[in-house]
Amino acid sequence: MSEQLSIADARQAEAIGRQVVLQGWVRTRRDSKAGFSFLELNDGSCFGNIQVIASADLENYEQEIKKLSAGCSVSVVGLVKESPGKGQTTEIEATAVTVHGLADTETYPLQKKRHSFEFLRTIAHLRPRTNTFGAIARVRNCICNSIHQFFQEDGFLYIHTPVITTSDCEGAGEMFQVTTLELDKVPKTEAKVDFTQDFFDRPAYLTVSGQLEAEIFACGLGKVYTFGPTFRAENSNTARHLAEFWMVEPEMAFYDLEDNMRVAERMLKRIFRDVLEKCPEDMEFFNLRIDKTVIETLEKIIDADFVRLPYTEAVDILTASGEKFEFPVDWGTDLQSEHERYLTEKHFQCPVILYDYPRQIKPFYMRVNDDGHTVRAMDVLVPKVGEIIGGSQREERLDVLQQRMKEQNLEPEGYWWYLDLRRYGTVPHSGFGLGLERVLQFVTGMANIRDVIPFPRTPGTAEF
Amino acid sequence: MSEQLSIADARQAEAIGRQVVLQGWVRTRRDSKAGFSFLELNDGSCFGNIQVIASADLENYEQEIKKLSAGCSVSVVGLVKESPGKGQTTEIEATAVTVHGLADTETYPLQKKRHSFEFLRTIAHLRPRTNTFGAIARVRNCICNSIHQFFQEDGFLYIHTPVITTSDCEGAGEMFQVTTLELDKVPKTEAKVDFTQDFFDRPAYLTVSGQLEAEIFACGLGKVYTFGPTFRAENSNTARHLAEFWMVEPEMAFYDLEDNMRVAERMLKRIFRDVLEKCPEDMEFFNLRIDKTVIETLEKIIDADFVRLPYTEAVDILTASGEKFEFPVDWGTDLQSEHERYLTEKHFQCPVILYDYPRQIKPFYMRVNDDGHTVRAMDVLVPKVGEIIGGSQREERLDVLQQRMKEQNLEPEGYWWYLDLRRYGTVPHSGFGLGLERVLQFVTGMANIRDVIPFPRTPGTAEF
């Protein structure tokens, strides 16, 4: 009997001589005058195809096999042989080809020619069948797995923080509202929406971050991380913004900012190393077709120590650089992308962890330094992308935290439980957030963030 | 220098003789007349505590150590020694105890006495610090990790299907609406809501299932799984319903219903085996305090073959059983929980996979059998919980699928891309859904689903 094999396995030398069943989708068909056809078959298990040799002797050769075109689905039974061809180790000599589904060449939207990414977004249900989007799916899977393994091996607990929330982590942030009220007849009492008739008896939103809830678990169970979807209702139509994206947020009790930096650096290096090791074919494709620097960039980062630089020194470096920036550099304002890129690409030529930012530009939960002017914030900057991680040591002192909330006009009532964490058994703790899609953009070189998530949600777009 | 160690590691015999730093929260303090105090310390790394012996010679003994109570946070430096006490391998002789945060015994809500789970839900920010909820967090983490490993080892790709959606997988289902319109002044044109002013230019909802999108990826990349939050806006105040819960949905190209059953059975056994192996202390606790049958039940399932039983035969068995059921058994209606429990608990005394359900009670996407009356649906039933997995082979034939949609009054326009999967290179494929919280209830014996998710969302409740 023939054994079921993935094409990834069938392409290895070890498969030679085995009688197998392969199942997948035809990429191309080429007919030889010598009385057989070559099918390039892909099943998603790897970037490369396997070549199937289908002889004219097969009973359905004329009626079916010769009609196969890009997108058709087949099962192939046959013998794996050493391939005489270049760039492939094996090929399969078919003894049977079963056709499951055809794909009419007149109407099938994926033609042989190269399609623009813009066009492919309109057929997001078919784009996983292309080389580029198959590769993105595998690299995305690899990175997710790498993240989980990194934390699991280090004793972190994976926790699920809620998507539906009634609190707002950043104190600002544009949020989506979640409701079961009928929008064409919203109930009101005294001209105000009557939320007692809504599902949760109060206004509810989609979370912008699981950090505050992750702190709950860290402040009782030590080391935890979240990995889930987060949301921004910003009307940003850029290549770097999504309304729905995935975020990883580790949070560690008894970790200070230096510990936090070490976790962030180790995690990024682990991700990059895994991608290069486990997806070499996919990465070669990105390096060849999308951005000729991606592999070299990742390799350099894996070997380099990240620079640690206080914000204040960064401002000094930028001021003294003689560089012409569009935006002025001024202590007390956020750095712009051009400044971040100057630091990582020109000045240091490696990732930089900026820390100790001005108090007034950072959220209330970041720990205030003894100088009173700065807080224990950190941003990890990488070449080309800029900020890829943002984090901080959290303010664990109840009185200082309350003072900071007052400064930022936050109502303590909504944060009673967050304050309780400081009231009972408070501990120094730290954490950060990593946007999965930003990492994917960095790793693959893909210019538009809409192309590294299966089904992008952006203003006006929620198809599929 | 002392090395940082988790309490899980410090409790092992290998730690004896090492100079360590432990950090965590005090569970209890007991003072000996012999001039020292015993602290039970927990850091979340495992169920058990470590006993810290703090001598009166320590400089902060009177001022600080003797004030320690449940919930206080400390760092302890000391030597790990063999413990003369029963039920513990090691203990630590402190050379320094640093107090990070006290927890006023007058106001700290977690007192020594046992609290009801209802009460603990009102302090969900503190309940991870209890034995029960620490154990749940570790078992939940273990199960999530087990699920990822199971699929990763088998070549599945983890994919993220969207939370915000404009389609409704089940064709029915009560959904939450997602909007950026201001509810107190919803814009209207001709008495209808003007969705062109909403974020996505149309009504958008929270997903009830990622299945249809998972099918997209399976029908191009082979074997995939989703693992993410899903939502139901049902007004169900039961111990088994949540408005927000996590679901795992594998989807496999070229898999028929029998293949699907095999994946489901293997996955459940893998989860149960991992939990028993990796969380033995936590499971002993559940077995002792929550449900005295959980360990035995899991062990039996791991060793048993799941029974496969067509729905029609199940109806025959139930009808012939002589059992008095509250609801009548009738071919063509859904089985009730009492029927499912009779089959798994009394008749077979093991998990049962029911399959080939009546066409009229199942969704449009399930493959129609040759008999015309049944579809290739399957439900995995386990003792006590009943249905834990629901799945099916999907209808891959375009014409049959279109006919089924017509039967169920579904508009094909909304499903153009789903139909395209059958139009171009269609393949037999199958998948199922597993509710994470149901599994957790089954594994731990916890009666209420609100206690196995960090922050439950239910009608009227979205605190934290």
Give the residues covered by each predicted segment.
Chain A
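Generic non-transmembrane alpha-helical segments
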Residues: S146-D154, M267-K278
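Class II aminoacyl-tRNA synthetase-like tRNA-binding/catalytic domains
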Residues: S2-E249, A253
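A translation/RNA-centric and nucleic-acid-associated enzymatic feature enriched
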Residues: I164, E174-R273, E284-F464
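Residue-level recognition of alpha-helix termini/interfacial anchor residues
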Residues: Y61, K278-D282
